[in-house]
Structure formats: C-alpha cells, structure tokens
Amino acid sequence: MANFTAADVKELRDRLGAGMMDSKNALVEADGDIEKAIEILRLKGQKGNAKRGDRSTAEGLVAASEQDGAATLIELACETDFVAKNDKFIALSESVLAAVVAAGASTVEEALQAPAGEQTVDQLISDRAAILGEKIALRRVARLAGEHQEIYLHRTSKDLPPQVGVVVDYSGTDAETARSIAQHIAFANPEYLAREDVPADKVEAERAIVTEISRNEGKPEAALPKIIEGRLTGFFKQVALLEQDYAKDNKQSVKKVVEAAGLTVTGFARFKVGA
C-alpha cells in the first residue's frame, strides 16, 4: 500500500513541474518522503541534462519586463519549437524573468545565480529541462535603466511566443515615438546606437573593403575618396541606429525622427531567438 497521498503527488508536481507518473514513481522509491523524492527526480534530471549538453538550442522565446525604472530583456533557448510554445516552458520563462528582475541582474552569470524561490535560476532551469526533456539555456540578459524605457516584443509566427525583443532607453516624453523606434529596431536590426559607437577597427576593415572594391571597378583615383566615403555612409546606415532610414518613412533618418519628437535615445538591446 502506498504511503503517500494524492496531495503529496500534487505537491511534488507543483514544486518541480514533474509529470504524474514520474512524481508517483519518485514517491514510491522515496517511501513517501517528498524531499527525498525531489532529490531523486533532480538526480535523474541531471543525468538526462548531461546527455543533452552538446545539443543545439536554436529555438525558444524572448521576454521582457519594466519595473522600478529599469527594463530587463531575456532570451530563453530550447531545442525545438514544440517546447518553445509549451505552457511549462512559457511559465518557466516568466519565473526566470521575475527572478532576474528582482535580483537586478544584467548578465547571464548574475542571472543564473539569482534566487528563484528555494533554488537559483540555474537550478530552476535544470529542473525544468529534465521535465521537458530538452536542453534549456538562458542565452542572453540585458538590463537598461535610463530615464524611460520602451519594450517591444514581436511574434514571427502566431503559433509561437515572441521571437524578437527590443528594449529602448530614452529621455523625453513622446512614448509613442519611442515605441515606434523600438519597432524599427526589431525590423532593421542595428548593431550600434550612433556611428561614433562603431569600433574603429571595424570601420577601418570596412574602409579597406570598399577601397579595394572601388579600385577594382576602375574608378578614377581622384574620385576614390568621395566614393569611399559614400560607401562608408551606406555601411553606417546598416549598423548604426541613428543613421538608418526610418522604417515608417524612409525619407527621414531615425536621428531626425527622434530629434523632431524631442527624444534622446541613450541605449537599446535587441534579441532574436537563435541569432
């Protein structure tokens, strides 16, 4: 006769998110001791997680939250889109995000050590990975804490949770334009805020490339400086947010749009699942 009750099974399932039969079997093995059953399930989960260690995590979701003058963006990765849209995985992302926000973490390392109930975030993820049967990883964390923040989460498929997430740090009062800039970032994928933020070695590498291309095209030597600068301007439009043509009106640059709205963009973060 089993020396545990249905309430014990429910408690175990609630605490670890384990399946019904896994919970029952663990309680049988633990002779009804819930704490021992938890350790049994965790040990089995760790063994399974170790086997999954080298697997790719190209699916998942992004999630974000704004609280106490700061916005936090995370990417939680898994192996398949089947798990990415699973309610347990989505609930895990919510728990992870809440713990990361509460801890004020701004890096993956800090986030993994953040308290999550009686566990750390790292342990919580490990437990849920064992239940879901896939490798799960907290891939990225960003925290912005300027004057104001705007969050935009984009679904690339109606069947999946958000796959692209953006947080914009800004000063000013035009929240509508700030949200539009966040949407632009999701679409245009800038790497830097301004041209001055692009590393010098990257600019010089691009300069060398466009110089060689221009010479190979047989451009007159006297015209090369102007041609090269023009092509570098195109490069800056690709990588620097403020230099880009505004997605909603390509006759204006993002810089002109934010200036007209009385905004100053002070930073941003953009995560795309698997990218």
Swiss-Prot record:
Name of protein: Elongation factor Ts
Subcellular location: Cytoplasm
Function per UniProt: Associates with the EF-Tu.GDP complex and induces the exchange of GDP to GTP. It remains bound to the aminoacyl-tRNA.EF-Tu.GTP complex up to the GTP hydrolysis stage on the ribosome.
One annotated Gene Ontology cellular component of this protein: cytoplasm
Primary localization: cytoplasm
Organism ancestry: Bacteria, Bacillati, Actinomycetota, Actinomycetes, Micrococcales
CDD domains: UBA_EF-Ts
Organism of derivation: Clavibacter sepedonicus
NCBIfam families reported for this sequence: tsf
Keywords noted in UniProt: Cytoplasm, Elongation factor, Protein biosynthesis
Keyword Protein biosynthesis appears in the UniProt entry: yes
